[in-house]
Amino acid sequence: VIRDSYKIMIRILHTADWHLGQTFFGYDRTEEHGVFLNWLAEEIRQKEIDALIIAGDVFDVSNPSAASQSMYYQFIYRVTAENPYLQIVIVAGNHDSAARLEAPLPLLQAMRTEVRGVVRKLEGGEIDYDHLTVELKNRKGEVELLCMAVPFLRQGDYPAVQTEGNPYAEGVRELYAQLLQRLWKRRTENQAILAIGYRIGNCREGL
């Protein structure tokens, strides 16, 4: 989080890599995931969380079962109904179908949930950086956080960079740098910048 010396009033809970629908060496983890989501819902309620972050790999496969999707949507409905100030930000991971995850966005926005799976392009082919930005409000209704909501980046999602190094790594770096530059110009004195993303390095990490 990039901020000045003021205190951020938004309580954030970060999660990643749910992998709903996963079968682990033949073992169906549905019961485990149900227990986890019940625990998470209770944590959100007890700790009065204002923003839940899900940083990639919501599902284990790009074409999740109806049961896995039902578990996901029921959780979102439950926690946003139980917690009237809760906002949710979700970015796609490499296991998720970017388009499938983002497809119900208009419905999810009615439940204060923002999903970023696809890196959209403007008419001229430039990256739509506004789409990769999510505003989070405090309980007074003031925008306090500008989120860099960046999904897992595939070839063609990031700016082309002339480099003798790793073109993927440098392209990803350039996208984050350009997005940060735009948000830095946009932010006001009382707003912080929160980076949310998904990357693969020596290990898989939701940021």
What does each model-identified segment do?
Residues 96-207:
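His/Asp/Glu-rich metal-coordinating catalytic cores
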Residues 79-88, 122-127:
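Short, charged helix-to-loop "capping" segments that act as catalytic/coupling loops
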Residues 62, 82-83, 91, 129-134, ...:
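Cofactor- and metal-binding active-site motifs of prokaryotic enzymes
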Residues 3-77, 81-85:
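N-terminal active-site segment of His-dependent metallophosphoesterases
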Residues 25, 58-76, 92-111, 117, ...:
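Metal-dependent catalytic neighborhoods of phosphoester/phosphodiester hydrolases
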Residues 15-16, 52-56, 87-94, 116-119, ...:
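Active-site neighborhood of phospho(di)ester-bond hydrolases with catalytic His/Asp-centered motifs
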